[in-house]
Design a protein with these regions (language model features):
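Helix-loop junctions and terminal segments of transmembrane helices
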Residues: 36-55, 63, 127
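Interfacial segments at transmembrane-helix termini and the short loops linking adjacent helices
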Residues: 84-116, 227-231
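Short alpha-helical transmembrane segments in multi-pass integral membrane proteins
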Residues: 62, 68-83, 160, 164-189, ...
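Small-residue-rich midsections of specific transmembrane alpha-helices
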Residues: 28-46, 70-79
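Interfacial/gating helices of multi-pass transporter permease domains
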Residues: 9-31, 101-107, 239-240
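Alpha-helical transmembrane segments
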Residues: 126-134, 182-200, 223-227, 258
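Alpha-helical transmembrane segments of multi-pass membrane transporters/permeases
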Residues: 115, 122-156, 164-171
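Membrane-proximal transmembrane or re-entrant/amphipathic helices at the cytosolic face
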Residues: 217-267
Length: 267
């Protein structure tokens, strides 16, 4: 939220830039809420319980399953947002006084925000691992460093790149945040990957890439409708997203990257 506030202030120095960022932000925040925030909220009570009971095996299972689910949700969303950013913005907001230039610039912002979506999800999940161990200081100080990096990049490169440096800086600082959180978790011996996660993670990557190719085909197939069909383009977007989701879900089930039980997060 601090990054968004800082980005908005800096973007106000360029005409219409605040609006471009606002519309892009609304879309990726929905995905973030599903892929990261919700999972973090659900697993915190369970993790805290088993940390108190010192059941390391249970803790490891919950951590890896939570990370697995966050990647299962955020990776395909990141790919879809990056591939279809212009069509998504056009279908949702490209009406009335929202010009083609506004669609193009908002889509560019969404593209770079989309690249950072897995990092945003990782931050929420990794932070929960610290909170369950009654450590709020470490993620707080790492977040401050990340915000400082974001501000520096945004201010230093704003004159050269304009408003688009803001989502780029946000994504870079978010990946920095997630990587540093992971390093501290490992150093404090609060987390480790298990074999099941590593196997499923590569399956999730494969399924996400295949979904991305399929979604790209849909976006190109319906491109004219998504960009120019004033009355029905939102329906074409819903249909494309639905088909992409079904394709991803079925492929994930087929290659055993995902099971129905995984979504329950109860162990």
């Amino acid at each position: 939220q601090i990054n968004i506030l800082v980005g908005t202030i800096i973007a106000s120095f360029q005409a219409s830039a605040v609006s471009y960022l606002y519309y892009a932000d609304r879309i990726y925040q929905i995905n973030l809420a599903i892929a990261g925030i919700a999972i973090g909220v659900v697993i915190l009570p369970q993790l805290s319980k088993y940390v108190h009971l010192k059941k390391k095996t249970k803790i490891l299972v919950i951590q890896n399953k939570a990370l697995e689910l966050s990647m299962f949700l955020s990776l395909p969303a990141s790919i879809a947002l990056s591939i279809g950013s212009e069509q998504i913005i056009s279908a949702l907001f490209g009406y009335g006084s929202f010009s083609e230039e506004a669609v193009y610039n908002s889509a560019k912002a969404l593209y770079y925000f989309g690249l950072g979506l897995p990092a945003f999800a990782l931050i929420k999940v990794f932070s929960t691992f610290f909170f369950a161990n009654h450590d709020t200081k470490t993620p707080f100080y790492i977040s401050l460093t990340s915000v400082a990096l974001n501000i520096f990049l945004s201010l230093y490169f704003f004159k050269s790149f304009g408003f688009i440096i803001i989502p780029i800086a946000t994504t870079i600082s978010s990946w920095f945040n997630s990587i540093v959180l992971f390093i501290f978790l490992k150093n404090k011996n609060l987390f480790s990957f298990n074999k099941i996660f590593l196997i499923k993670f590569f399956k999730i990557i494969f399924a996400s890439i295949m979904m991305g190719l399929f979604f790209r085909f849909l976006v190109l197939f319906f491109e004219n409708q998504l960009l120019y069909d004033y009355y029905l383009k939102s329906l074409y977007l819903i249909w494309s997203v639905f088909l992409g989701f079904i394709f991803y879900l079925l492929l994930s089930l087929l290659i055993k990257a995902f099971k129905y039980e995984d979504i329950k997060l109860k162990y």
